[in-house]
UniProtKB/Swiss-Prot annotation:
GO biological process: DNA catabolic process
Lineage per the UniProt record: Bacteria, Pseudomonadati, Pseudomonadota, Gammaproteobacteria, Enterobacterales
Swiss-Prot/TrEMBL catalytic activity: Exonucleolytic cleavage in either 5'- to 3'- or 3'- to 5'-direction to yield nucleoside 5'-phosphates
PANTHER family tied to this protein: EXODEOXYRIBONUCLEASE 7 LARGE SUBUNIT
One GO cellular component term: cytoplasm
Entries under Pfam families matching the protein: Exonuc_VII_L (PF02601), tRNA_anti_2 (PF13742)
Protein name: Exodeoxyribonuclease 7 large subunit
Length: 462
């Protein structure tokens, strides 16, 4: 018999089911803050992530029907606040949170509000370039809307004093941080427009956190800047700080000191410009006087050219020149006519028959002499070639060999005999001498022993 009652023994499934029911009934919905990690966004549209702090973490899920209402894109490392239900995933025994809503925490929430306001005002056209006013150059009086106790005012006044001490400055004091600051900034802008004593305004403050600068991200401040008839330079924080006022303002300065430089004139630069203008004016005067002097010289020269005596002298010189040209032309014409007459006379002389016949006879005699010389030269060359050929022919002729005492012996069949082996005793042979033939009959053969040895050796080698 078992020592445990069966009703006290849980199965794993029953235990997980009981724990899930307890969690859902006892805890209900809760608000939870933490840092996102292990964020997963599969194609199903659901979100799975872990919410953690420095000592613990818990798994979370947010289904597609809920995350559709989230107005920002969550990222790992981001601090958020969620409203969720605690439950337990029975197959694994893991408890988790089912998030129903999500919003950024701290600066993340402020950044979300900043982006939403920025998009809305941009859609209304408050940032359009066509509404930007041009800053006066030079400014006659500058208004500064900022805190009288902040470093921004000190920096602005110091820069204006250094660059343009004669430029008047009016300060419209206001708070730049806190709940009341946006309304005070709006009233200062409206007051400056009502008094209409400045032709440019600097609105800004020194650096700080996003929360410290939040007054310049207020919609009321943005609309007051946009409605201002006086051009406004936005100078909020440092160069890396960006506010809504920077987008709405007519010009953005990275710092309050830079804003003071933008609205003021540099005295040294002004002196340099005056000197430059003076130099340009002097150069223009010098150029104008030089032009007038050249014009006077030209007119004086023209007046001298129109004097009657000078005109008469020019006409006389022209007459002499024309007379010389006429003489030259006549001489040229006479020379050409003389040369043409000489050429015609030469051609006439060349056309007389006696001269042509004489030239033809001379040519015929010359050709006859050349032909005779060529024939004699060719005959001599042929005689020389014939003599050389006869000498060479006699050198290789058999008759010449016979004339030197040699003979040629043939067998009865006419075959030329070259050695004893071709002859048999009793055979009749014919011998050719220089001046005839001799027939003889072979009685004895006496071969040369050295020739026989050579033939045998040659036969054995082959």
């Amino acid at each position: 018999m078992s020592q445990f009652p069966s009703s006290a023994i849980f199965t794993v499934s029953r235990l997980n089911q009981t724990v899930r029911q307890l969690l859902e009934m006892e805890m209900g919905q809760i608000w939870l803050s933490g840092e996102i990690s292990n964020l997963s966004q599969p194609s199903s549209g659901h979100w799975y992530f872990t919410l953690k702090d420095e000592r613990a973490q818990v798994r979370c899920a947010m289904f597609r029907t809920s995350n559709r209402r989230v107005t920002f894109r969550p990222q790992n490392g981001q601090q958020i606040i969620i409203r969720a239900t605690i439950t337990l995933y029975e197959p694994r025994g893991d408890y988790q949170l089912l998030a129903e809503s999500m919003q950024p925490a701290g600066d993340g929430l402020l950044q979300q509000q900043f982006e939403q306001l920025k998009q809305r005002l941009a859609a209304e056209g408050l940032f359009d370039q066509q509404f930007k006013q041009v800053l006066p150059s030079p400014a006659k009086q500058v208004g500064v809307i900022t805190s009288v106790s902040g470093a921004a005012l000190h920096d602005i006044l110091q820069v204006l004093q250094r660059r343009d001490p004669s430029l008047p400055v009016i300060v419209y004091p206001t708070s730049v941080q806190g709940a009341e600051a946006p309304l005070q900034i709006v009233r200062a802008i409206e007051l400056a427009n009502q008094r209409d004593e400045c032709d440019v305004l600097i609105v800004g403050r020194g650096g700080g956190s996003l929360e410290d600068l939040w007054s310049f991200n207020d919609e009321r401040v943005a609309r007051a800047i946009f409605a201002s008839r006086i051009p406004i330079v936005s100078a909020v924080g440092h160069e890396t700080d960006v506010t809504i006022a920077d987008f709405v303002g007519d010009l953005r300065a990275p710092t309050p000191s830079a804003a003071a430089e933008l609205v003021s004139r540099n005295q040294l630069e002004l002196l340099r410009q005056i000197q430059s203008q003076r130099q340009r004016l002097e150069m223009a005067m010098d150029y104008y006087l030089a032009q007038r002097n050249r014009e006077f010289t030209r007119l004086h020269h023209r007046l001298q050219q129109q004097h009657p005596q000078l005109r008469l002298a020019r006409q006389q010189a022209q007459l002499v020149k024309l007379r010389q040209r006429l003489d030259d032309a006549m001489q040229q014409q006479l020379r050409q006519t003389s040369r043409r007459s000489e050429r015609l006379q030469q051609r006439l002389m060349q056309q007389q028959p006696q001269t042509r016949i004489h030239r033809a006879q001379q040519r015929l005699q010359q050709l006859s002499y050349q032909m005779q010389s060529a024939v004699d030269r060719q005959l001599n060359q042929n005689k020389q070639k014939l003599g050389v050929a006869c000498s060479r022919l006699e050198g290789v002729s058999p008759l010449a060999t016979l004339a030197r005492g040699y003979n040629v012996t043939t067998a009865s069949d006419g075959k030329v005999l070259k050695n004893v082996a071709q002859i048999t005793p009793g055979e009749t042979l014919k011998t050719r001498l220089q001046d005839g033939w001799v027939e003889s009959q072979v009685t004895t053969l006496a071969p040369n022993l050295s020739s026989v040895k050579k033939r045998r050796k040659s036969s054995s080698q082959s």
